[in-house]
Amino acid sequence: EEVGQAWIASFFHMVIVVSGMRYKRWILPFLLFAAALVMSMQVLAVPQALPLANRAYVIDSGHGGKDDGAQHGDVREDAINLAIAREVRTLLIEQGASVIMTRDGDHDLAGEDVENRKREDMQQRVAIINCGWADAFISIHLNAYTSANVHGAQVFYQEENAASKQMAQQIQQQLSASTDTKMSAKPGDYYILEKPSVPGVLVECGFLSHAAEREQLQSESYQKTLAKAIVDGVIAYERYEQ
């Protein structure tokens, strides 16, 4: 009986965070349905006074596994993305939201034998976002540029989606208040923004190519600052949408 209970707990943990294995296409919808069912039951226990009660989000931590993303020496984007994404998840849950992570470990979402890993990885991320459970998504990334002087967090959105634009502007406003970024929210031509069926944003949390910002991005305290700004922006967006 204990083994059975442990298996069930492990299964639902795997479903909720959507990590730890490579999904075949036919099983992903089933896993997402199970996750949505569990999350819907959890929502009943959330205090309704919390600002994000009854709201559900997908947090997409960019890159992972064989795809490190941007790099500077031994500093890897994918690891920092995941650290920030986990902080965002924690804060969203504290505010009453339900959360699914596209990944919660050092892996991508492509199968082992897939030739075009990047395409498969992105398709799986979008499939998770489009599961029918989420109200919105947030994709976490870091930037890099040929000039070492460029720095600052910046939020991107799909140009024709008014809700995504509003979310991006609210998050950018909070990032500007919490960090020294001078960037503005702007439209972005990214697969992760074009294909989902719900509003969402891509947050470039800073530049690994900028020495001072690179040091900040590796700091747990700065990661928490970024996460809080993102979640404060989400709360402001939800209030605006009401």
Whereabouts are the PLM-identified features?
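Catalytic-site microenvironment of enzymes
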Residues: 2-242
